[in-house]
Swiss-Prot record:
CDD domains in the record: YqgF
One BP term from GO: rRNA 5'-end processing
Protein name: Putative pre-16S rRNA nuclease
One Gene Ontology CC term in the entry: cytosol
Organism whose genome encodes this protein: Synechococcus sp. (strain JA-3-3Ab) (Cyanobacteria bacterium Yellowstone A-Prime)
Keyword annotations from UniProtKB, A to Z: Cytoplasm, Hydrolase, Nuclease, Ribosome biogenesis
Length: 159
């Protein structure tokens, strides 16, 4: 069995935008052109649903995104709570406003992972507050990218 190291590099250009939708802020992350790595990009301060959607659309244009990935904060048992319902409403509004796929992933514990990542990177606790939303978006997007890559590789024929 051989490994095709050029597999990812031969695909069409790819740009995913990841969102961590909270009550006050929306963390924004983006993927590299190969769909391998997610990086936190910034934060949208929430104002109103139409303004929030317009800000996301601006990020989509800026990044030339081909897909938007939104984290849904499911409860520990996988059920939908009040915060998840709020995010689902946001997702429906976004889907109506953009002409590209908007997919959701379970973001359970993404903030915990983001805090750990920032600590491991040596970011002081005071500085973490400003970065946590975009890092959570990066965790959400990275989860989706990894799942996408693994599902594609499991479908690839063995050589």
């Amino acid at each position: 069995m051989s490994t095709d190291l050029n597999y990812s590099a031969t695909r069409d250009p790819f740009s995913a935008l990841g969102l961590d939708v909270g009550n006050r802020r929306i963390g924004v992350a983006g993927s590299d052109g190969l769909g391998l790595l997610a990086t936190g990009l910034g934060v949208i301060r929430r104002r109103s649903l139409p303004e929030d959607i317009a800000q996301v659309q601006a990020w989509i244009r800026r990044r030339q995104a081909t897909v938007v990935v939104v984290g849904i904060p499911l409860l520990a048992d996988g059920s939908v709570g009040s915060q998840a319902r709020k995010v689902q409403r946001f997702v429906r509004a976004l889907q109506a406003a953009v002409d590209l796929p908007v997919v959701t992933v379970n973001e359970y514990l993404s903030t915990v992972q983001a805090e750990w990542d920032l600590r491991q990177a040596g970011i002081p606790a005071k500085a973490q507050k400003a970065l946590i939303d975009q890092q959570s978006a990066a965790v959400i997007l990275q989860t989706w990218l990894d799942e996408r890559r693994y599902s594609q590789s499991s479908k690839a024929p063995c050589r």
